[in-house]
Swiss-Prot record:
Name of the protein this chain belongs to: Testis-expressed protein 47
Organism the protein comes from: Mus musculus
InterPro entries attached to this UniProt entry: TEX47-like
PANTHER family linked to this entry: TESTIS-EXPRESSED PROTEIN 47
One Pfam family of this chain: TEX47
Domain of life: Eukaryota
Name of the encoding gene: Tex47
Amino acid sequence: MSFMVHNRKGSKKQFQVDPLLLPKVPRTNYLHLQEEKHRLQLKKFLLHRMFLVGYIQGNTEKKDISEYYEQLFQSILKHHLGESVTGLMLIYPSTFLHILESSNGTLFRILLDYVAHEKSETEFMLQNMKIVVASHNIPTRLFMQWHISAIKVPVLYLDDESQSPSIEEVTTEFLTMTHKLALQLYKTVKLGAKGPGDNLHQLAPELILPEQIIKYLCKAEEFMDPASFLSMYNRPIHVTLDSDIVWPAPSRF
């Protein structure tokens, strides 16, 4: 036993390695690992933004709509992986404007739930919904949270049909004003705050769309309803190759 100990001591003196030559292993901690995990997880889901308009069933309270969506968001994120939902919902006397930001799967399930209610309930509180625009792979969010606000403004009517603007002009104005409103909220509403509440039309009255524009978009045939959108989304894409046409030959050579 003493021989082995003596041999080890001798080997230490003969094979002493310069510390500068040892390979350097990068050191990290648990916080860095969690941040890296969170960063990689965020990269798995691309962000999308969707603009929706529609009608509200008579005598529907803002509280009922708010509870419906909050429970729906929680249920989706509880059972499916995806991004949290941010956006803004404006409740007019008879219509609504809803902007949603989330991952593709989450938005898909939100529309799917609406279609299920629409088919099973003749008087569901949200009706005749239309998708005005769906923006894919957006770089950043416009909203930090999901807010809902009741809008109480005087009704402004569009001009007569002979002088009414085109659908392109109305859609452009719609998107321009909603983006300006989103930027205003981004600057004024802090993360974690309750949001503007029902005073939004007082904080930025010049950025609130008249309800008549929302009604105009709801009636436009150019926009798809959620059921048609989901049907197109699930429809397989069949690509006809040249070989499918040329071979087999319709007749013998």
